[in-house]
Amino acid sequence: MASTKDEVVRMSVDEYWEDIKDDYLIQLANTDPNEVYPSNNPGPTTADGQINFECHCVGHLVGSPCGFEFREAITCQKTNSDGEIEQGACGKELMSFMECVTRTQCFGTGDNDKK
């Protein structure tokens, strides 16, 4: 019995570049992105200067095996001045994060072949 979970649809290059015919898709294509995504993700920092841990740019770090250590290190960095950081603030947190990365190899390429 064939699975009905997935369906492969093939189209030619010409079909791909044809005008959109579906009314809903036409409406969606002509909609302002801010209306489609009303909670547009602002990036790594929110408007009030807080850390946006939901940003796609840090989401993989937060969700990694070293996510706790990452959050500790970045929170420390954001709550201390450049001068305090130069004086050694956040060193413990950063080292804890780096030790976790080294220990778990959570940012490896997934390529097990030795070169």
Curated annotation (Swiss-Prot):
Organism in which the protein naturally occurs: Caenorhabditis elegans
Residue spans crossing the bilayer: none
Gene Ontology CC: mitochondrial intermembrane space
Positions occupied by motif Cx9C motif 2: 90-100
GO molecular function, one term: protein-disulfide reductase activity
Keyword set, alphabetical order: Disulfide bond
Chain location of the short sequence motif Cx9C motif 1 per the record: 66-76
Keyword Ubl conjugation part of the UniProt annotation: no
Pfam families documented for this protein: CHCH
Highest taxon above the source species: Eukaryota
InterPro entries: CHCH, CHCHD4
Domain CHCH, chain residue ranges per copy: 63-108
Protein name: Uncharacterized protein F42H10.2
Keyword Disulfide bond: yes
GO terms, biological process: protein import into mitochondrial intermembrane space
Disulfide bonding pattern of the chain: 66-100, 76-90
